[in-house]
Design a protein with these regions (language model features):
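Non-transmembrane, aqueous-exposed alpha-helical and coiled segments at domain scale
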Residues: 1-210
Length: 210
């Protein structure tokens, strides 16, 4: 279990400068502020449900699906409920299937692929195989449904948030710690980007910045 948590921390540690919270690190650091203020700003970005808070939303959505889909192996019933979620008629009314889609990855998110492997092993060890395969079915159905409903012409894959909440749950980590664990891992990446910003000593970043 310690190995799985270690892998999760490594996968969340850094993911380039294009994500919202890391870009926040660059923007705030460019003003010349101190490290604590820059990291605090990045934390504010990360906690949002469309960013680092998505793993908690995936977990809550998964519990909602388990309660409302009677036969977890019935793909028709599962598909119909996922459509309700997308049509804002179920779960939190956002129309989002959390943990699906990424700005860069389409075919697969390598972080999710690695975490899924460990999730499967943990689920087998803890007697939660049925739950794992339900999550797996959601993953395989959701991509096509999202593309169809949103009229998108690209593949949509699960991102790292899709399986991280499931892994944390199996490890008996409480929900309120999901996003803080993400932050603990990502601070190393934020600090690296802050150092990069300070070393380059560039102009203050503004909306028209190039």
């Amino acid at each position: 279990e310690a190995r799985v948590l270690d892998v999760a921390l490594i996968l969340h540690a850094e993911h380039g400068g294009g994500n919202n919270s890391t870009f926040t690190t660059h923007v705030v650091s460019s003003t010349g502020t101190d490290t604590y203020s820059a990291i605090a700003a990045s934390l504010g970005s990360l906690k949002g449900p469309k960013h680092g808070g998505a793993n908690l939303k995936v977990k809550q959505m998964f519990e909602n699906i388990k309660e409302n889909v009677k036969d977890w192996t019935d793909e028709t019933e599962l598909t119909n409920y996922l459509i309700k979620i997308l049509d804002k008629q179920a779960f939190d009314g956002s129309g989002l299937i959390y943990g699906m889609g990424h700005a860069v990855y389409t075919l697969s998110d390598p972080r999710a692929t690695i975490l899924k492997k460990y999730a499967k092993l943990l689920a087998k060890e803890k007697g939660l195989t049925d739950e794992f395969y339900l999550l797996d079915r959601i993953e395989h159905l959701a991509g096509g449904l999202i593309a169809q409903r949103r009229k998108l012409f690209k593949d949509i894959c699960a991102n790292v948030d899709f399986y991280s909440g499931f892994v944390y749950t199996i490890l008996d980590i409480p929900e309120e710690m999901f996003t803080p664990i993400f932050a603990i891992a990502r601070i190393s990446g934020w600090c690296a980007h802050r150092i990069e910003e300070l070393v380059n000593d560039g102009k203050i970043i503004r909306p028209a910045y190039k």
